[in-house]
């Protein structure tokens, strides 16, 4: 069974529509795919309507978070009064109730901040001599949630950088980079609490992706685990083999699940659907822990999880509070 738990559509910063994404997932030989657009579940219904036979769709989102660290660099769950530094991170949330009001409100706050943030990055790039315009970025984003990848794509189109990845450097858009602009982000401890309250499961995405900027220290990951974090994403394109081995050891020490995922964005990045996958036993445990929503199977039913512990449902099954998921 092939399982990819980290993908993006045009509902955020991918290039595949939700319908195209699930069709491409089936064509890639996947049995299970999670749609984890940034801070939104807006693409889920369209993906569900287009779900091919034999493919299971997992409700998900990639939540934008910021961990405040004390000046010493240790972990911590709250801001210090003397201006502690913060580290941006992404929290994958699975099988939560999308209608849970507090979590929905936080996702909306993050989304509302995306346009002014992207405009700020455009302004900084123009100050650096890049002939980029807001109209160009908005056109690239279309109906999606505008973000750094759209700005990066504009930079590629202008010939400023060769690839989207090349824009995510300290010279340009990486965390703390010359054209970087902060945005509203959840405290990760709050994110864990809110997702759990909505019946979901949390996995820390690409925790040691050094090319993206400063990473969260392992001491802070231990604190997140103590606060209820379920797992960490280990097999990811931004982790080399030594990093993956290090993360597997950390997960074993902390009792965390380990996942693997493509972080697929369509043509915007080079990664392919199913390039990295999650072990079926791990996926089964994620499904068993979740109470907020159930994976949805395409016509003919989806793949069965280990032991069949209620991990998959027929289309139209209702989740928490009677809401169809």
Regions of interest found by a model, annotated:
Residues 1-87, 172-174, 186, 192-193, ...:
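An N-terminally biased module of ancient metal coordination in phosphate/nucleic-acid-related enzymes
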Residues 52-222, 277, 282-293, 301, ...:
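Extended substrate/RNA-proximal surfaces in nucleic-acid metabolism proteins
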Residues 234-305, 316-325:
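C-terminal appended segment following the main domain
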């Amino acid at each position: 069974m092939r399982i990819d738990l980290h993908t993006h559509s045009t509902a955020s910063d991918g290039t595949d529509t939700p319908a195209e994404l699930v069709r491409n997932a089936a064509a890639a030989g996947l049995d299970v795919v999670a749609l984890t657009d940034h801070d939104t579940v807006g693409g889920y219904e369209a993906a569900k309507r287009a779900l091919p036979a034999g493919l299971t769709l997992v409700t998900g989102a990639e939540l934008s978070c910021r961990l405040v660290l004390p000046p010493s660099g240790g972990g911590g769950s709250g801001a210090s009064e003397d201006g502690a530094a913060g580290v941006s991170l992404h929290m994958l949330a699975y099988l939560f109730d999308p209608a849970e009001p507090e979590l929905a409100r936080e996702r909306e706050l993050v989304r509302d901040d995306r346009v002014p943030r992207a405009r700020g990055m455009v302004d900084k790039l123009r100050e650096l001599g890049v002939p980029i315009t807001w109209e160009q970025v908005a056109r690239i984003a279309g109906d999606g949630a505008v973000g750094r990848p759209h700005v990066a794509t504009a930079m590629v189109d202008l010939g400023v950088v060769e690839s989207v990845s090349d824009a995510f450097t300290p010279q340009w858009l990486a965390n703390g980079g010359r054209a970087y602009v902060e945005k509203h982000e959840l405290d990760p401890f709050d994110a864990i609490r809110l997702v759990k309250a909505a019946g979901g499961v949390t996995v820390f995405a690409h925790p040691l992706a050094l090319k993206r900027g400063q990473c969260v220290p392992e001491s802070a990951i231990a604190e997140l685990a103590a606060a209820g974090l379920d797992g960490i994403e280990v097999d990811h394109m931004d982790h080399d083999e030594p990093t993956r081995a290090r993360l597997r050891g950390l997960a074993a020490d902390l009792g965390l699940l380990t996942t693997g995922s493509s972080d697929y964005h369509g043509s915007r990045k080079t990664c392919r659907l199913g390039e990295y996958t999650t072990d079926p036993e791990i996926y089964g445990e994620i499904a068993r822990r979740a109470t907020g929503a159930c994976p949805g199977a395409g016509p003919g039913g989806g793949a069965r999880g280990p032991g069949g512990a209620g991990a998959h449902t027929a289309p139209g099954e209702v989740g928490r509070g009677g809401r169809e998921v």
